[in-house]
């Protein structure tokens, strides 16, 4: 047991928190960071200027509490999402993790179950634990896919009260077809399950990929969560949001902290939404780099998964940790997600992507046994 865990063990922690470690990817000082799926292109200059101006204006009123209902921001988010959504359908918080936490606070808790399908976003079980919600680990196919029949059966078998569907899935990058969402929703009727479709990376999906937003009408237990951390390059600003039936957003108001969304955060998000053309242009370039990575990994004899995100999950590695370390030694940090034979890399700028591909190929050429 580590010293940190020993110190924690001396405190009167809740039982379900004992032995746990805080969530977090390695934060290392290396030239090329491709490990946490950030938008590697940064904030364009004109968007920076708009944010600076908006925050300066907000600063003049920082002695007052912010708009508790963040009305203007909800209007802008509804307009951005489209699909006939109104501000009453929108909720936002400090990152999509806080949105998910608020959903669990409202609909989870002692005696209730949340179902996820690993490998998937590693925060789901931590959020469940933090709200005393039992986390049930479902199963995927051998290729990490999830089909409608299997997913629906697992919802019925577990009697889950909350279901997490990550699309595109993290860490695999693969999207879910909407028939899976529909089947899961119908299967959750008996337990009145809240179905969350986590679309944090949806803007990076291939053209004409449908969103679960199209399924919201008539489905009051369906929630679609999004974030401005990825496509909008605002990971440092912390703004996540969701779309759902108005009664669901009203339920979230029961558990939110007062004035939870600062005036600075609201101003930043609004400025980015109002100047999103440049940001979406960067998204298109990131998609080009992602597809380039897939093509090059295939050429190297590796096994990349089809990706609708800003990262690529790839297998075919006998010793992924050694490859990870070799890349780190070359100044490139990617993610070892703990899945045998696999690693995950964020699509970088063109020079960053080139550096990753060249370093990886050099490692593979010099250490052939690492290829399975």
Curated annotation (Swiss-Prot):
The modification N6-(pyridoxal phosphate)lysine is found at residue 230. Pathway: Amino-acid biosynthesis; L-histidine biosynthesis; L-histidine from 5-phospho-alpha-D-ribose 1-diphosphate: step 7/9. Its EC number is 2.6.1.9. It catalyses: L-histidinol phosphate + 2-oxoglutarate = 3-(imidazol-4-yl)-2-oxopropyl phosphate + L-glutamate. Keywords: Amino-acid biosynthesis, Aminotransferase, Histidine biosynthesis, Pyridoxal phosphate, Transferase. Transmembrane segments: none annotated. Coiled coil: none annotated. Pfam families: Aminotran_1_2 (PF00155). Its cofactor is pyridoxal 5'-phosphate. PROSITE patterns: AA_TRANSFER_CLASS_2. CDD domains: AAT_like. It is an enzyme of class 2 (transferase). GO terms for molecular function: histidinol-phosphate transaminase activity; pyridoxal phosphate binding. The keyword Repeat does not apply. GO terms for biological process: L-histidine biosynthetic process. InterPro entries: Aminotrans_II_pyridoxalP_BS, Aminotransferase_I/II_large, HisP_aminotrans, PyrdxlP-dep_Trfase, PyrdxlP-dep_Trfase_major, PyrdxlP-dep_Trfase_small. The keyword Amino-acid biosynthesis applies. Belongs to the class-II pyridoxal-phosphate-dependent aminotransferase family. Histidinol-phosphate aminotransferase subfamily. Homodimer. PANTHER family: HISTIDINOL-PHOSPHATE AMINOTRANSFERASE, HISTIDINOL-PHOSPHATE AMINOTRANSFERASE-RELATED. This is Histidinol-phosphate aminotransferase. It comes from Paenarthrobacter aurescens (strain TC1). The lineage of its organism: Bacteria, Bacillati, Actinomycetota, Actinomycetes, Micrococcales.
